[in-house]
Amino acid sequence: ARQQDPVYAVEGIADDQRVVLERQFPRYSMGGAGLAIDAGHSIVVRSEVAYFDRWHVTNPYRNHGSSQSPMVKSLLGVDYLLRNWLISVQWQEQQLLDWQQGMVQDKREPLFTLSAEGTHLRDRLKSRLVLAMSPPAKDDALLQGIFTYTPVDWLKLGLEVDVFFGKEDRTFGQYSQRDQLRVSAGYLF
């Protein structure tokens, strides 16, 4: 498989003395497993774990601007169906097993998400509300709302809102001054 997020490797120096970077999507091997258990009463408990052998991370201190490390990703989640709403609580953990000085990714990256997805008005209105954060919440959080409305069979309207909080050096906090509002319309055929 290939990494979805690029690693930036140093390609060389341009004539005007700027460093030239190349986006790379390195290959890696991955093994993993998942388990989901129906706990009854509309509750599902799920878990996943994955091991990546050569995960590449941008590192300006290394030759060609990148390092590699084995990485483990794990997830524990609980889903609850309440009428027309699917409520999910999820804890994810990502850990570089051979973290090196200069890597632009933290050795350990936890992520907590709480989401609710629902349908209303005979499935014409769909809502998704999300709170995502890396502890502590005041340092790194995202509030997101996604709404789609289909007033007639051939028209789909959308509204998405992202509000970021936190410190500039954190995953969501780096966008704290760039909240987003997106409006869309689509013709369905």
Short names for language-model regions:
Residues 1, 31, 47-51, 89-93, ...:
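Transmembrane beta-barrel strands of outer-membrane/channel proteins
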Residues 2-7, 53-59, 95-101, 122-126, ...:
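Gram-negative outer-membrane beta-barrel proteins
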Residues 25-100:
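Long, well-ordered mid-to-C-terminal structural blocks that present hydrophobic/aromatic surfaces
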Residues 30-34, 73-77, 113-115, 144, ...:
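Membrane-embedded beta-strand positions in outer-membrane beta-barrel channels/transporters
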Residues 36-38, 79-83, 117-121, 148-150, ...:
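Structural signature of outer-membrane beta-barrel channels/translocons
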Residues 42-46, 84-89, 122-127, 153-159:
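Repeated loop/turn-to-beta-strand initiation elements of outer-membrane beta-barrel proteins
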Residues 176-189:
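Outer-membrane beta-barrel "beta-signal"
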